[in-house]
C-alpha cells in the first residue's frame, strides 16, 4: 500500500487564499474584500477626478449642459458629479459604448461608472461583514444592520432611476445635488405624506434620541474606580469581566423618570432594540422610495375640507401641495413648459369667483 506524501511547500495560490481569509490580519480582506477593494477604489478615483475636472453634462438631453466640477466654477457645496443624460436613459453606458471620450463625458458617463462600482463595492462590504463574523464565530446581525443604509443607497441610485426610466433622475453626487434631489422628489411624489417616510423619520430621530439617552444613562451610572482628580475613563480596563456601569441604578432612574416599564431590565434586549429601531425605520424609507419610484406616491389630501357652501378650507396638506407645485415649476425649467401636475389636470383657479364685468 502506497501513501502519497504532499510537499511541505505551499503553492502561491494556497498562500494567497490563506492570507485573504486570515482573521489575524490588521485589516481583514476576505473573498468579498477581493471584490470590494477594486470597486471602491475605481469609484473613489473616478468620483474625485470628475468632481474636480469633468466637463458639463447634458443631463436633460436637450443640449443644455450643466456644469458640476470645481474647475468650471463650482465650490465644495455646489459641485457634483452630474447624472448621465436623459438621452442615454437606462442604457448601460461604459466608455467603450461612446464614440469618443468627449462624448462619454458630455453624456455623463462618469456618473454610471461611479454609481455601479460604488453599489457593487458597498454590497461586497456587507458580504465582508458577514464573512468576518462567520470566521470569528459571531452572530450575523452586524451585516443585517448595515443592510439599512445599503438599501437606501440602492433605492436612490438604482431603483429610483429604473422606475423613472432614466439615470438622469438619479441622485447627483454632491451636497447641493442631494438637496435638489430631495426637493424634486417631494414635488413629484409628495414623500412627506408617505407613511414609510414617516416611519423612516421616526427611525432616524428616534434612534438618535435613544442613543443619546443610553449613552447619557450609562455615563451617569459608571462604577467609580478612580479618584475625584482622575478621569473616570481610566477606571475601565479593556476586556475586564465586571460591568463598568450599574445597570440597576440606570434602570431605577429611568423607570422613575418616566414609568417602570419604559425602562429595560435586560441589557441584551436593550441593545437589540437600539439596533433594530433605526434599521427598521430606514428599511421602510428605502421601501417607500422604491415604491414611489414607480409613482405610487404619498397620500393626497389636497382640498379635502369644504365649508357649507363648497368652498375649500385650506389645510397643511394644501400648503405642502402649493410648495410642491412651486418646486416642480422651477426644476428642469427648460425641459418642459409646465410641470405634469399643471399640464394634465384641471387648472386650479386663482380667484374663488369670477369678477363681474359691466
UniProtKB/Swiss-Prot annotation:
Q: Write out the residues that bind a quinone.
A: 214, 263-264
Q: Topology versus the membrane, per the UniProt entry?
A: Multi-pass membrane protein
| EC number(s) from the headed UniProt entry | 1.10.3.9
Marked site, Tyrosine radical intermediate, at 160
What does the Swiss-Prot or TrEMBL cofactor note state? The D1/D2 heterodimer binds P680, chlorophylls that are the primary electron donor of PSII, and subsequent electron acceptors. It shares a non-heme iron and each subunit binds pheophytin, quinone, additional chlorophylls, carotenoids and lipids. D1 provides most of the ligands for the Mn4-Ca-O5 cluster of the oxygen-evolving complex (OEC). There is also a Cl(-1) ion associated with D1 and D2, which is required for oxygen evolution. The PSII complex binds additional chlorophylls, carotenoids and specific lipids.
Q: State its location(s).
A: Cellular thylakoid membrane
Per the UniProt record, which residue ranges are transmembrane?
Answer: 28-45, 117-132, 141-155, 196-217, 273-287
Query: Keyword Calcium: yes or no?
Result: yes
Q: Which InterPro entries match?
A: D1/D2, Photo_II_D1/D2_sf, Photo_RC_L/M, Photo_RC_L/M_CS, PSII_D1
* Keywords per UniProt: Calcium, Chlorophyll, Chromophore, Electron transport, Herbicide resistance, Iron, Magnesium, Manganese, Membrane, Metal-binding, Oxidoreductase, Photosynthesis, Photosystem II, Thylakoid, Transmembrane, Transmembrane helix, Transport
Q: Which residues are assigned to the propeptide feature? A: 344-358
Catalysed reaction(s) here are: 2 a plastoquinone + 4 hnu + 2 H2O = 2 a plastoquinol + O2
Q: Which residues bind pheophytin a?
A: 125
Annotated site residues (Cleavage) in this chain: 343-344
Its BP terms in the Gene Ontology are: photosynthetic electron transport in photosystem II; response to herbicide
Q: Name one GO cellular component term.
A: plasma membrane-derived thylakoid membrane
Q: Where does chlorophyll a ChlzD1 bind?
A: 117
Q: Which NCBIfam families match?
A: psbA (TIGR01151)
Additional observations: Cyanobacteria usually contain more than 2 copies of the psbA gene. 2 of the reaction center chlorophylls (ChlD1 and ChlD2) are entirely coordinated by water.
Cite the record's note on assembly. PSII is composed of 1 copy each of membrane proteins PsbA, PsbB, PsbC, PsbD, PsbE, PsbF, PsbH, PsbI, PsbJ, PsbK, PsbL, PsbM, PsbT, PsbX, PsbY, PsbZ, Psb30/Ycf12, peripheral proteins PsbO, CyanoQ (PsbQ), PsbU, PsbV and a large number of cofactors. It forms dimeric complexes.
Q: Which family does it belong to?
A: Belongs to the reaction center PufL/M/PsbA/D family.
Protein's name according to its UniProt entry? Photosystem II protein D1 2
Instruction: Please give the organism.
Output: Parasynechococcus marenigrum (strain WH8102)
Amino acid at each position: 500500500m502506497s501513501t502519497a506524501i504532499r510537499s511541505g511547500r505551499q503553492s502561491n495560490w494556497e498562500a494567497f487564499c490563506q492570507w485573504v481569509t486570515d482573521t489575524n490580519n490588521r485589516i481583514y480582506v476576505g473573498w468579498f474584500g477581493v471584490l470590494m477593494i477594486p470597486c471602491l477604489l475605481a469609484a473613489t478615483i473616478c468620483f474625485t477626478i470628475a468632481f474636480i475636472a469633468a466637463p458639463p453634462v447634458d443631463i436633460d438631453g436637450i443640449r443644455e449642459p450643466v456644469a458640476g466640477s470645481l474647475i468650471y466654477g463650482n465650490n465644495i457645496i455646489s459641485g457634483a458629479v452630474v447624472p448621465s443624460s436623459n438621452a442615454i436613459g437606462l442604457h448601460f453606458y461604459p466608455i467603450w459604448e461612446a464614440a469618443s471620450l468627449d462624448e462619454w463625458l458630455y453624456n455623463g458617463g462618469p456618473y454610471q461608472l461611479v454609481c455601479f462600482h460604488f453599489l457593487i463595492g458597498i454590497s461586497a462590504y456587507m458580504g465582508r461583514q458577514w464573512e468576518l463574523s462567520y470566521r470569528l464565530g459571531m452572530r450575523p446581525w452586524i451585516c443585517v444592520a448595515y443592510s439599512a443604509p445599503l438599501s437606501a443607497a440602492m433605492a436612490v441610485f438604482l431603483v429610483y432611476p429604473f422606475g423613472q426610466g432614466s439615470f438622469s433622475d438619479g441622485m447627483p453626487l454632491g451636497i447641493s445635488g442631494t438637496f435638489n434631489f430631495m426637493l424634486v422628489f417631494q414635488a413629484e411624489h409628495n414623500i412627506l405624506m408617505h407613511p414609510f417616510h414617516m416611519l423612516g423619520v421616526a427611525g432616524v430621530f428616534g434612534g438618535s434620541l435613544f442613543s443619546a439617552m443610553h449613552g447619557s444613562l450609562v455615563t451617569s451610572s459608571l462604577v467609580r474606580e478612580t479618584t475625584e482628580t482622575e478621569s473616570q475613563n481610566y477606571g475601565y480596563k479593556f476586556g475586564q469581566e465586571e460591568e463598568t456601569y450599574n445597570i440597576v441604578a440606570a434602570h431605577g432612574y429611568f423607570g422613575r423618570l418616566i414609568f417602570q416599564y419604559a425602562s429595560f431590565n435586560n441589557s441584551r434586549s436593550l441593545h437589540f432594540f437600539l439596533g433594530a429601531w433605526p434599521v427598521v425605520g430606514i428599511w421602510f424609507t428605502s421601501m417607500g422610495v422604491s415604491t414611489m419610484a414607480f409613482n405610487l406616491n404619498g397620500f393626497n389630501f389636497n382640498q379635502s375640507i369644504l365649508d357649507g357652501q363648497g368652498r375649500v378650507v385650506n389645510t397643511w396638506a394644501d400648503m405642502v401641495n402649493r410648495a410642491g407645485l412651486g418646486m416642480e415649476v422651477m426644476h428642469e425649467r427648460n425641459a418642459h413648459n409646465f410641470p405634469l401636475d399643471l399640464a394634465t389636470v384641471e387648472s386650479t383657479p386663482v380667484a374663488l369667483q369670477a369678477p363681474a364685468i359691466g
